[in-house]
Every structure is written in C-alpha cells, then in structure tokens.
Amino acid sequence: MSMPPSIAAKLPLPQWAYVPGETAEAEADHDTLWQAMALVPSRFQDFVPARHPALRYGIALNDAGYFWESQEILEAVWAAAPQGGRERILLRACIQIANANLRLRMQKPRAAARYFGEALVELDTLGRNAAAAGDGFVEAFPTARLAALLKAKLAQPALTKADWVEFGKIGRA
C-alpha cells in the first residue's frame, strides 16, 4: 500500500525513532506525531477510508522503521474506527506487527514472535469474515499476503532484527 501524494506525504518523519529502554519517553518526538493525530476524527462513520492520511502515515512510519511511532498513530486511528468493524481487527493486527517489529529492534525475539502470532490470529479472523468490496482499509489491504508472510516468519527457528515486517509494502509486492 504505497502512499500517494497527499497530506500524509507532507507529514514529516519524526526526528528520531523512540525505543523503550534506549531513550526516555519524554524524548519521543510527540510534536511531529501530533500533526498526524490531529487528522484523526473523533469517530469514523462506517469504515476507515483506505486513503486516510493518518492511516497512511502510520503505515509509512512502520515501513520507515519508526515502530513505536507507528503504533501510536495506528492506535489513534483504531480508537476512532467503528466499534465492531473489520477495520478495528486489521488495525489491531497492524499495531501488533509494529509492536513485534519494535521488540525485534530491542532484541526480544520471543516477544516479537508472540505479537506476530497475535496479529496472525486477527488476520485469520478477517479471512473467515469476508465482506463486500468497498473503500475501506480492510477491502484495500492484502490480508492474505500479510498472513502468509507472518506464517513464514513464525516457521523460522528464531527471529532476528532483520525479520521485521514492512506491512505497507505487502500491497505493492
């Protein structure tokens, strides 16, 4: 899922990637993240649009290696997503993947594997509950491809820092 020229493309990347235990949370670049958070409505109506700038920015942050920051933005989008909606399930999976990626950076492969496994459960839930085509995040996202990638990662004997997942690139493969 590449980022089109839009508001999301104009949002700056944080000045640094926050990593728990390496930097104090007060040192996270909250000023930059606030710009994206301000784009998230209090509630999305029926679905989260696949092209919503905060969603795209959260995905781009993950793919650029800003895992903690990605999780923060995606959690804000998740909180505004319709209750019980399919987007909440996919967003939860993406949040767990960003968290797993962060754990890999922190050299905690077992925790990363657990988060990848939890994300896979969410993706399997989506696969069982197919819906009609639309303009929502779920309909535009290749969940089956992402699930296959997670299964391959989890089948490895051990995960390393190099095993992090760029879920935005899944749609472009």
Which residues make up each language-model segment?
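N-terminal alpha-helical interaction modules that lie
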Residues: M1-P82, T125-R172
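Residue signature of alpha-solenoid helical repeat architecture, marking inter-repeat boundaries
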Residues: V48, R88-L90
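Generic structural signal for well-ordered, non-membrane alpha-helices
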Residues: W68-E75, I95-A98, G117-V121
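Solvent-exposed loop and edge beta-strand segments that line ligand/cofactor-binding
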Residues: Q83-E87
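TPR/TPR-like (Sel1-like) alpha-helical repeat modules
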Residues: Q107-R128
